[in-house]
């Protein structure tokens, strides 16, 4: 194989890897993993803050 052909194959492999990794971290409903994690963390923070009077006074919008 020539240098040009090897470079073309390299680019195709990089493109295929990028497409696979980009689509594999998406959830079926369209939300990605970071958005799901944030959705799980938020109620936990609210629950912890609302039980602490000092935090509740600082963040009344959470409780």
Curated annotation (Swiss-Prot):
Tissues showing expression: Expressed by the venom duct.
Signal sequence, start to end: 1-21
Residues making up the propeptide: 22-47
PROSITE patterns: ALPHA_CONOTOXIN
Intracellular or extracellular location(s): Secreted
GO annotations of cellular component type: extracellular region; host cell postsynaptic membrane
Main subcellular location: secreted
UniProt entry keywords in alphabetical sequence: Acetylcholine receptor inhibiting toxin, Amidation, Calcium channel impairing toxin, Cleavage on pair of basic residues, Disulfide bond, Ion channel impairing toxin, Neurotoxin, Pharmaceutical, Postsynaptic neurotoxin, Secreted, Signal, Toxin, Voltage-gated calcium channel impairing toxin
InterPro entries documented for this protein: Conotoxin_a-typ, Conotoxin_a-typ_CS
Span list, region Ser-Xaa-Pro motif, crucial for potent interaction with nAChR: 51-53
Disulfide cross-links: 49-55, 50-63
Entries under Pfam families matching the protein: Toxin_8
Molecular function per GO: acetylcholine receptor inhibitor activity; calcium channel regulator activity; toxin activity
UniProt superkingdom: Eukaryota
Protein family membership: Belongs to the conotoxin A superfamily.
Other information: Negative results: shows a very weak inhibition of tetrodotoxin (TTX)-resistant sodium channels. Does not show activity at TTX-sensitive sodium channels, L- or T-type calcium channels, opioid receptors, TRPV1 and KCNQ1 channels. In vivo, does not exhibit any significant side-effects for spontaneous locomotor activity, cardiac and respiratory function and drug dependence.
Free-text function comment from the UniProt entry: This amidated peptide potently and teversibly inhibits Cav2.2/CACNA1B. Steady-state inactivation is enhanced at hyperpolarized membrane potentials. Also shows a weak interaction at alpha-3-beta-4/ CHRNA3-CHRNB4 and alpha-7/CHRNA7 nAChRs subtypes. In vivo, exhibits a potent analgesic activity in rat partial sciatic nerve injury and chronic constriction injury models.
UniProt note: domains: The cysteine framework is I (CC-C-C). Alpha4/7 pattern.
Identification of the protein by name: Omega-conotoxin Eu1.6
Annotated organism of origin: Conus eburneus
